[in-house]
Amino acid sequence: MSDRRRIVRAVRGIRGEVEFEASVEPRFDYGRRSHRLHVDGTAAVFEANDQRLQLTSVAALERDSDDVRSRFTVRAGDTSGFVLESGASGSPHQIGDGEVIRLFLDTGAYWQRWPEQSSYRGRWREAVERSAITLKLMIYAPSGGLVAAPTAGLPEQVGGSRNRDYRYTWVRDGAFSVFALLGLGFTEEATVFGEWLRARVDERAGEGSGPLKIMYRIDGSSEVTEETLDHPRRLHGLASGADRECASDQLQLDVYGEAMNSIHALDSGALRDWGVGHEGWQHIVAMIDWLCAHWHDPDEGIWETRGGRRHIVYGQLMSWVALDRAIRMAASRSRPRTWTAGAARGTASTPRS
């Protein structure tokens, strides 16, 4: 699948006359990597190693150090705009005001049509549909990964130090989103993340450290390390350094319950192009077998504690959910099952915190 993505900005004059100034200031690798810039009339190309951004404009562009600016006047009836594209190769093509408006209107039309497939007919429908649109925008289409939040440095507390980059995929957050999307009738988006999740189960089946990581990069890779970025400039007098979030090596037992809850929902929903085959079922069996051996272990839990592992009831409850959903899947498809007794024992022997 192509990694080409475009941001379209259209400027239309309604009445009067307005002096307009626009700037494009990209920063690669959290601002740590310098880039090359080439500006030619109404086009500009930003390049940093293997990353490339291409900017085309109706109005003329001018270089401002490593950035690009455009100054123009908009009068009633005038149209101008910009297209910023990633992944494009070759030289930028000249773009006219008509093409900018077409791209803008086509994009708007798509997002107006998309909620029509929703099955939701309850109260506050507009707010619900806007929330669904936000969830869809958080899906990385090439892989199906769903980011926990589209933020990269908002502080948990004003003036605080925990400015996390949440543009990673947490199994827990993604699983919750599957249920939200399924409940609203957006089965395609739910299925896409289900495929992403099933691939993670398949690739880690039988590994001694546990079949699942709690979080991944959006492309599905698990090479995630925590890193503090001290170099960003101060913003509004507050420290704006960002932390690349990482608790990826923690044990959080609840993710198995959330993952299996989602897989069961998709498997039992008779969705087109979804199904757990023989090999996939064997990988699920390996995951549940591992969980049966470890679900009474202390863990860092849903709160990602940094002070050592402890028994957390929520994680052990969700471990039971994982066993329950696996048993249901086995029963509904006449698959082998061996965990019924383990699930029954677990309800009577959950350790206290």
Which residues fall in each region the model found?
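Acidic, mature catalytic/reactive cores of soluble proteins
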Residues: 1-353
